[in-house]
């Protein structure tokens, strides 16, 4: 019952635009230093750690210390800081690892592959010939679909 009340309270705060740490969120605990991690970088807003289930050597995660469910919830200033931090980390990791490229991945909601509901960014080093699969079938943008989307976006 207490967990249900706490979760309801957090949801009400989120709807009001007030974010706070979720006591049951594994990434909140890691970001706060309550759970040990291989920390590559830390500041007042973020912790960057090595992923325990890496897609490739050097796969890292950027975790904000404040709890946001996903990109829809994070405030603009912190989202911008996350991207600047991603750039900084990718440059440093490329120098250290000698990788050939990078994927920066950020999933939102279960259907898009989000498994931990705390905003985070994956920094995935890529190496020539690696078997990391981040591809999708290329479709075709028809005139009808293009026009429909453009109209709805006005």
PLM segments and residue spans:
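Charged/polar low-complexity intrinsically disordered segments
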Residues: 2-3
């Amino acid at each position: 019952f207490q967990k249900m009340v706490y979760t309801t309270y957090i949801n009400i705060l989120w709807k009001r635009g007030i974010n706070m740490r979720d006591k049951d969120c594994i990434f909140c605990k890691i970001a706060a230093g309550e759970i040990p991690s291989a920390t590559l970088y830390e500041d007042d807003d973020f912790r960057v750690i090595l992923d325990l289930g890496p897609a490739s050597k050097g796969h890292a995660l950027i975790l904000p210390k404040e709890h946001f469910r996903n990109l829809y919830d994070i405030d603009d200033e912190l989202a911008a800081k996350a991207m600047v931090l991603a750039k900084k980390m990718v440059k440093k990791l490329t120098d250290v690892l000698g990788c050939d490229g990078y994927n920066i991945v950020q999933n939102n909601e279960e259907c898009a592959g989000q498994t931990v509901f705390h905003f985070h960014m994956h920094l995935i080093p890529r190496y020539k010939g690696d078997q990391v699969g981040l591809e999708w079938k290329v479709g075709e943008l028809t005139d009808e679909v293009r026009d429909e989307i453009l109209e709805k976006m006005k």
